Amino acid sequence: MKPSIKVIIPAFNEADAIGHVIRDIPNIVDEVIVVNNGSTDDTQIQAEQAGATVLFEIKKGYGYACLKGLDYIEHLNKKPDIIVFLDGDYSDYPEDLTTIVLPIIEDHYDFVLGSRTSGLSEKGAMQPQQIFGNWLATRLMKLFFKSSFTDLGPFRAIKFDTLKQLQMEDKTYGWTIEMQLKILKQKFNYTEVPVRYRNRIGVSKVSGTLKGTIFAGIKILTWIFKYSIKSCF
């Protein structure tokens, strides 16, 4: 039986990119859910015109937007089998979604991460602070949890039932690392697949600003050390 797949895209002022993202998503997806995270541009209009379901979340934060999308799904009569998370800036290649969900469909993995560290990334697409942050976080996860993750990339797929069991809570920059740490902690089956990555449209709201970079770094380290301490008891 064909699995039901829904995509959640948090978006803040991505009017120039969001339409491209939605239109490039493969037709194996049942529904594309864009969470307009307080945008002041035409993100909502562009997303609706491209055929997405658009929700509005006034509280700023990547986690807030993701949780809004999950709350919407929780209230649907028919729940999906797989949830895919994807950024709205067109840095990921939405066409790679078929590659990301395949290990869940064919090999019964619970979680699949699209890794940007496999040499498929466009030159300059990942900023130095992103590269260093990824390296540090994945090294720490390997040290504390024997993890094989190589990236914290936002392009990922997860079984809906698995996602519910994770009981996600981070509201801002720590959403991605929280998910990966809980996958490790609860011993779900996971794998990575290489994905392409290009220079985004517009300026990054996280790594493109000093404030965003600092707060993201603090969040990531906080989650890692929080779970490393828990693992000792």
Question: Which residues fall in each region the model found?
Answer:
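A conserved acidic beta->alpha catalytic loop
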Residues: N36-I45
